[in-house]
Amino acid sequence: MEIKLEHIEPKDIERQSMALIQQELDRRHIRLDAVEAPIVKRCIHTSADFDYAENLVFSANAVDRMRTSLRAGIAGSASADASAGGRSHDAGASGSSHADASTEAWVRDAGAIVVTDTEMARAGISKKAIAALGAETRCFMSDPDVAAEARARGVTRAVVSMEYAARIKDRPLIFAIGNAPTALIELYRLIHDRGLRPAGIIGVPVGFVNVVEAKELILSLAEETAPIGDIPWIVARGRKGGSNIAACIVNALLYGIDDVKR
């Protein structure tokens, strides 16, 4: 049997993959929302699964609102630069380095935090893009204190991890959940019982036990009144998902922000 391999330059592989994805979507007569399309296509590109064209659902303006939150560090940097500029004009060269440090601190303190439920998802998020926005990623799953508390209480580490993340104040929190449905269930509880107001929830855990139900809990937030009903989310309905899907959704959000390079 003769197998013919196509020669393609490395830099062109992703572009051609996306073109093939669009061809298949056209063949299936699937029309995606223009804003949501890059997110859906990246999920398909990551998984080779066209079901995401049907089962990936978005709350109203979820993409734009999450991108705005991811840009919080840029907004903080601009404000700090303006403030630092006035100080450095008076302080001279010695004041300039102090102003630079203040700017960096402002970005770090203002930037969004993407919280994942696996180190795999965290590792898959573009470090360059996150850093360019003054944002950061965190995963509490391997924290010894989280593991110890989870054992003592008889709950999953994902539950305790969400509680730890919810303690972070005054910074936009975007939760990217690709593995543990208990993380979504706990987020739902924290939203109702502890006043947690995430800047976004990416709910794409994969599996069988309580996976569908946990996702439906997040979808049900849209039925509530503000402010709970205003929490933006992106959810993969059904059993499909995974840490790779959670990471690729975050990356698709990042890559759609002006001036963000991979």
Each model region followed by its residue ranges:
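Glycine-rich phosphate-binding loops that contact phosphosugars or nucleotide phosphates
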Residues: 157-158, 166-169, 174-194, 209, ...
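C-terminal functional extensions of proteins
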Residues: 199, 209-262
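Intrinsically disordered, low-complexity terminal tails and inter-domain linkers enriched
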Residues: 71-110, 224-228
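Electropositive, gly/pro-rich neighborhoods at or near active sites that engage anionic ligands
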Residues: 1-74, 106-108, 112-113
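Buried hydrophobic positions in well-ordered alpha/beta secondary-structure cores of metabolic enzymes
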Residues: 117, 202-203, 249
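Short glycine/serine/threonine-rich phosphate/pyrophosphate-binding segments
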Residues: 121-124, 181-187, 208-212, 242-246
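Long, charge-dense
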Residues: 129-170
